[in-house]
Amino acid sequence: MNKKAMAAAVSMILAGGAHAAQQERPNVIVIIADDMGYSDISPFGGEIPTPNLQAMAEQGMRMSQYYTSPMSAPARSMLLTGNSNQQAGMGGMWWYDSTIGKEGYELRLTDRVTTMAERFKDAGYNTLMAGKWHLGFVPGATPKERGFNHAFAFMGGGTSHFNDAIPLGTVEAFHTYYTRDGERVSLPDDFYSSEAYARQMNSWIKATPKEQPVFAWLAFTAPHDPLQAPDEWIKRFKGQYEQGYAEVYRQRIARLKALGIIHDDTPLPHLELDKEWEALTPEQQKYTAKVMQVYAAMIANMDAQIGTLMETLKQTGRDKNTLLVFLTDNGANPAQGFYYESTPEFWKQFDNSYDNVGRKGSFVSYGPHWANVSNAPYANYHKTTSAQGGINTDFMISGPGITRHGKIDASTMAVYDVAPTLYEFAGIDPNKSLAKKPVLPMIGVSFKRYLTGEVQEPPRGNYGVELHHQAAWVDGEWKLRRLVPRGLTAGDAPWQLFNLHDDPLETHDVAAEHPDRVKAMSEAYEAFAKRTMVTKAQGKMIDYVGIDSKTGRYLAVDPATMKPVPAPQAIPVSEIH
């Protein structure tokens, strides 16, 4: 099926969903992109052709002020549970002296919370998962143990997209593996991540009895680095980015204005993209353009796989009653590669020559300048930060009851609102006890009645998030943020204040002009932090490189020296709850 025909099929599926019988339980599909920038896809101003996502946007709603976490695993934990990342157990991507051994920092899903998979399974849904997990790889935290009937899971945070499954770096190696229904599996020669995840999901949906509803979690690893795509997809974008950073950025800004996401009088961040491009030699420009070409190919390929999913829904008669959510975990990744705490020897295995960029055996990242383009209108601050560019990401929803087709809504919505929203659409009681002991109540609120137009006032007025002492508190048009530089010891920084109505791109800190507001908002944030189990990051950074099979303890190391941290400071798996 060609792209136009596929997009037309998607449009028919999504339009039909709006007319499904309300008493029939909807299928629910959550699709996640990994490290994707705010304006990469066409529904949010991107030049990369994404016809299937565009059709979804036109038949559903876009939330332009959707807030998430600065990084992947914490965001996924909030999404899957409706709780804060600390409540879920993912208070960090690593530890500090002050957080290791503390509740909220187990670095895996705990039984303090209930997952969407567990609740949908209890309600009779066939619960399916394909793609990135990143929520724990110790007993009790795997997809099968957290509610999925079937799961084809990449367990770690990132890997190469072909069948060689090379880890992101030295310390990532121990959780770089795939499982199918809990058993480790090898990958076929023709494996490419996005295609394999969609193919497996399509197969499971087709095998599900027609009378049984489906809850599907399709978590692409695209476009997370290393940037890789099949040759035929890379060729489609040949020459497209040789105009350089600034021109692509300007075109995206113009489209964002046309969509109404920003306005003509919106203050823009200071960038020198023309200067940065002109500082490159012609050979460097050609190489850098090729890297972005690969990135675009990854997103276009992902969209095509979403199209195959839509076709499967049509073939199985589920097209008129499927609630579809698309989002990304965090902002664009500005890293330039050769990081992830790896040894120099690790990087010697890659062939990053021009001809091999994007192919198996290469490892490239697009760096801060393309990240500024990818994340437009946000710039300078991206993934890992509490700036808008780190936590304000794409969100779309379509299906039964979503009637405001094509609308872009600027109401504040939180990542932990997704679970309660989907529960209400499916008629699931989120307070029903599924465990032997009580779990924490969700902090998210349902947007169901707002999304269907039953009420006109959005249910959320504020949003809080914390990760590694990066913090943000959004209250209406005001935002308080703390930007902490990343290093081998925990940092600190004063609060900054921004008026998102006048300055949505955070170009002018007005904290000094509004001390009373800073005080009130910081007190509100501290109350949120206390309620959601936040422990302030202090002291040295501590990473983990595996699990000791003899003692059942995490193998914790000092990343500055890669020497083990004394065993008493590590967390016994048996004590994690």
Curated annotation (Swiss-Prot):
GO terms for cellular component: periplasmic space. It holds the Pfam family Sulfatase. Binds 1 Ca(2+) ion per subunit. It is found in: Periplasm. The active site is at 72 (nucleophile), 134. GO terms for molecular function: arylsulfatase activity; metal ion binding. The conversion to 3-oxoalanine (also known as C-formylglycine, FGly), of a serine or cysteine residue in prokaryotes and of a cysteine residue in eukaryotes, is critical for catalytic activity. Keywords: Calcium, Hydrolase, Metal-binding, Periplasm, Signal. Its EC number is 3.1.6.1. The modification 3-oxoalanine (Ser) is found at residue 72. Residues 1-20 form the signal peptide. Plays an important role in the mineralization of sulfates. Belongs to the sulfatase family. This is Arylsulfatase. The gene is atsA.
